[in-house]
Amino acid sequence: MEDLLVEVRLDNGAYYKGQVTAVADDGIFVDVDGVPESMKYPFVNVRLPPEETVEVAAPIFEEGMEVEVFTRTNDRETCGWWVGIIKMRKAEIYAVAYIGFETSYTEICELGRLRAKNSNPPITAKTFYQFTLPVPEELREEAQKDGIHKEFQRTIDAGVCNYSRDLDALIVISKFEHTQKRASMLKDMHFRNLSQKVMLLKRTEEAARQLETTKLMSRGNYVEEFRVRDDLMGLAIGSHGSNIQAARTVDGVTNIELEEKSCTFKISGETEESVQRARAMLEYAEEFFQVPRELVGKVIGKNGRIIQEIVDKSGVFRIKVSAIAGDDEQDQNIPRELAHVPFVFIGTVESIANAKVLLEYHLSHLKEVEQLRQEKMEIDQQLRAIQESSMGSTQSFPVTRRSERGYSSDIESVRSMRGGGGGQRGRVRGRGGGGPGGGNGLNQRYHNNRRDEDDYNSRGDHQRDQQRGYNDRGGGDNTGSYRGGGGGAGGPGNNRRGGINRRPPRNDQQNGRDYQHHNHTTEEVRETREMSSVERADSNSSYEGSSRRRRRQKNNNGPSNTNGAVANNNNKPQSAQQPQQQQPPAPGNKAALNAGDASKQNSGNANAAGGASKPKDASRNGDKQQAGTQQQQPSQVQQQQAAQQQQPKPRRNKNRSNNHTDQPSGQQQLAENVKKEGLVNGTS
């Protein structure tokens, strides 16, 4: 910069120090002391300062010599070089009279303020050389820094080398002509070195920041250091270091360092809480949880719904179910327990703890539910065992089962009062085929395998009932049934009142064929059945009596099988089942019937009941009535009764004709009509 020093003469005639800032064709821009801004001055007003020489002795000033005095006219002005003549000299004090003023002005000056008159001529256009060097765009920002071109300026002997934003170039000013030539040779090298210098400067600045951070870290009170497993470093760092950047933004965290070789994080912070928060974001781990094998499916859930919910709520990165023991792909590093499957949790330590809490709670719930289910199964087994032991042959049907017809079924309530004679454990209300072999103990209402040909059997056909184990009305058994009546001592006691799959009654042709099935060889069994019907009719309600009487009246014109007639009536429309008006028979017929069958009834009841201990009051009343009316029986009826007893009965079934004899159909029809009339009169 000293090469660009000049002296500029201002309007007052004095020369002032200045520095060249730019060179123009008709002048030069100089920054003069005492002038606010750089201004352009003509070349004639500018000169170079005198050369400074090393003088061995002080200069000798004599009187009358022209000298230049460094002074000023007032205190507000800047000092400049003024021309004067020495008037008097005394030691080192000189009296100088200034030249160029209208009035003479003399001043006493010291030796240090004096110098010899400057003999340099004014400068010209070739005194200073100025040229520009364009700067690459990528280096313009760095070229503006102060002192960055200092070495380049010294090498080319330039007085000044500055970057101009207006020109985007380096402005070089020098007193030497060779400066421009050197600059042309070195500019490429200078700009290449400048780019390297910029990179080094950036590294220097980064190092300075690290130094500052280190100083701040040294002032920090809390430091946490932890290690992350090698295979989990990617999760800890995050995508493009996102996790580390997020941890650095935590309030109070001053520094986070990572040693990649040892996979160690070092966190420094102002408070312990901030350091712990940053550690929770970076510390990834892997832990195992043993789940019972039988609960693995329930823990995972349908389509993985339960395990996915645990992942979402806990924030864990991944839950992996390890391969089951025995598989080829199982990891040997995973600890295993007997009858357990390890679940592998991968994520931050905090998220793994949350996942364990959720999984433990779900497992405790599953175990509790399984325990309740086992208790319920044990109770069900005990209940089933008690029902089987108490119900016996009822096949564990609930005791409290009600009739399917509901409470309002009067017909069902009336029918439930019927039933055969009681056995050892049968109901007293029952009636029907008692004896040693009556009934098989199955309720037809709950069984599907009953035979259609049994739907229309006679109520007193004991031999066939004993063989097949069925009872028409009550069945009977030593155990009985919920709805059934009586039964014998030996049979299981089936109730013929139908079940869920009860078949519809047969047509008239089938019913007509059923009338002909007979297994008894004597008329005594038939008479016993008819007399039992009379006794029961006396003891039933008015509804039962009228219903039975209508069925007897319907059967007066057909074969004399009581149950068959009832079955035929059931198949007819309801309009055809209206009670028919009957002519009351003569009292003699009733008396003859009761007297002729008294002894047969007693013997039939004895055989049917098998020594039953519960006779009915209706049977005793029937015996008294028969004894009273026996004397009034006409002789004609007795003869017909005797003829009927002497003649054999017709065959009921050709396949069972071994124990039966033929009987004319006319006599059989006559005898049955007489008996029916007596039965109807007896029940009216």
UniProtKB/Swiss-Prot annotation:
One of its GO terms (biological process) is brain development. Residues 555-581, 588-613, 625-648 have a biased composition (Low complexity). InterPro entries: FMR1, FMR1-like_C_core, FMRP_KH0, KH_dom, KH_dom_type_1, KH_dom_type_1_sf, Tudor_FRM1. One of its GO terms (molecular function) is identical protein binding. Residues 221-282, 284-353 form the KH domain. Keywords: Cell projection, Cytoplasm, Neurogenesis, Phosphoprotein, Repeat, Repressor, Ribonucleoprotein, RNA-binding, RNA-mediated gene silencing, Sensory transduction, Synapse, Translation regulation, Vision. Residues 387-398, 660-671 have a biased composition (Polar residues). Transmembrane segments: none annotated. Highly expressed in testes in the early stages of spermatogenesis before spermatid individualization (at protein level). Homodimer. Interacts with AGO2, Dcr-1, Rm62, vig, RpL5 and RpL11; these interactions form the RNA-induced silencing complex (RISC), a messenger ribonucleoprotein particle (RNP) complex involved in translation regulation. As part of the RISC complex, interacts with Tudor-SN. Component of a neuronal RNP at least composed of Fmr1, tral and me31B. Interacts with piwi and vas; these interactions occur in the polar granules. Interacts with Cyfip. Associates with polyribosome. Interacts with Ythdf; the interaction is RNA independent. Polyribosome-associated RNA-binding protein that plays a role in neuronal development and synaptic plasticity through the regulation of protein synthesis of mRNAs. Acts as an mRNA regulator by mediating formation of some phase-separated membraneless compartment: undergoes liquid-liquid phase separation upon binding to target mRNAs, leading to assemble mRNAs into cytoplasmic ribonucleoprotein granules that concentrate mRNAs with associated regulatory factors. Mainly acts as an activator of mRNA translation: promotes translation of stored mRNAs in oocytes. The C-terminal disordered region undergoes liquid-liquid phase separation (LLPS) for the formation of a membraneless compartment that concentrates mRNAs with associated regulatory factors. Belongs to the FMR1 family. This is Fragile X messenger ribonucleoprotein 1 homolog.
